[in-house]
Amino acid sequence: IDHVTGTLAAVLLVLISIGIFAAPLVLSIFAPGWLVDDRPEFDLSAGMLRITFPYIMLISLTALAGGILNTFERFLVPALTPVLLNVSLIAAALLLSQHLEVPVTALAWGVLAAGLAQLILQVPALIRLGLMPRPRWGWKHSGVRRIMKQMIPTLFGSSVAQVNLLFDSIIATFLVTGSVSWLYYSDRLLEFPLGVLGIALATVILPNLSQKHAKANTHEFSATLDWALRLAVIITVPAAVGLAILAGPILITLFQYDAFQPDDVRMSTYSLIAYSAGLPAFIAVKVLAPGYYARQDTTTPVKIAIAAMVSNMLLNILFVGLLLIQGFEGPHAGLALASSAAAYLNAILLYRGLRKRQVYSPEPGWTRLWVAVSLACTTMGALLLFMTHDTESWLQASAIFRIRNLSLTIVFGVIVYIFIGMVAGLKTHHLLRGAK
């Protein structure tokens, strides 16, 4: 642990130093549209990039600490860690932005603060285990070398999502000014349920699946995956419906202050709705991929991720092109929609692979589950739409009114969903038993 921590920190420190110095060059590669049009966003983004570059080292060390904790079955802290980024960004947007000369730079400082908070959160748990690293250089250490060889396939597979995001950003820089920001705000709101549920589920089931595979217990391996998928459906489908319907009120409540105008809310709403459609698929990928990793199969998820990446790139061009031809005011939403479609392709291919290898077989009751979830979501969605159809009143309301009404609306929606779901036959106690 000491050698891995020290080597990782040293390598990242060098990369970060280069990144801070060469920020304009990096930005010209990943946001060429701003450079070609000589937009003012270029210099601003270069400055924000310099602020956020240290986050790479902070989150990498946080991930290493989280891996240590997961190994010793300490899941709570790593599962809660991603939430801090969303909380920090929201706090920076609401509290810090109004005190800065350029309000949007508050988000960059929010990212940096989140990195520090995420890393600090791991420390008490590591100390309690007696595993607080004492960084040491160990490039030639056998353990470091072994980890480097094992992590390359997983690292490549994980980077596919980032490549998709970069490709989206490149295209967005050629669209109307504000497209990158609208996608970013939408993505941040999508990352909240992904961080809370997706990463938490993946974190919990991976060691569980690994144990089942080591014991050659195929039935329990399949049952664990089935439980995780059912839980994902029960939570993510209503979350997707709620996020899409409440996109406007959520964006207004969190961001519609000062420079963030009603037009920004409308444009961000388009992309948030498109992202929301893919939420169940994004979570499903995080649940299904551990089914391969637990069996030491890191190659198949990488191949599938590459296929999804290529499809995402092609769909980006297709969807954005179609929206531009139709004269739609928010062609950037095509980028979000392409990401959602690619996520479904990823999830379907992962699912088919597990079925083909006969390591996963759905348990009875899926039809009843889908019927119950569909009825509950339809009822909840209709009521939420009725309660929030007047967006204009939200725009004119005070911050306190917005927060109060949004909170009450969400609570009401959750209650309606649970009630209708239980009436329709949703058995949540079966899911709780499946977690054991």
What function would you assign to each model-found segment?
Residues 1-436:
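Membrane-embedded alpha-helical bundles of multi-pass transporters/translocases
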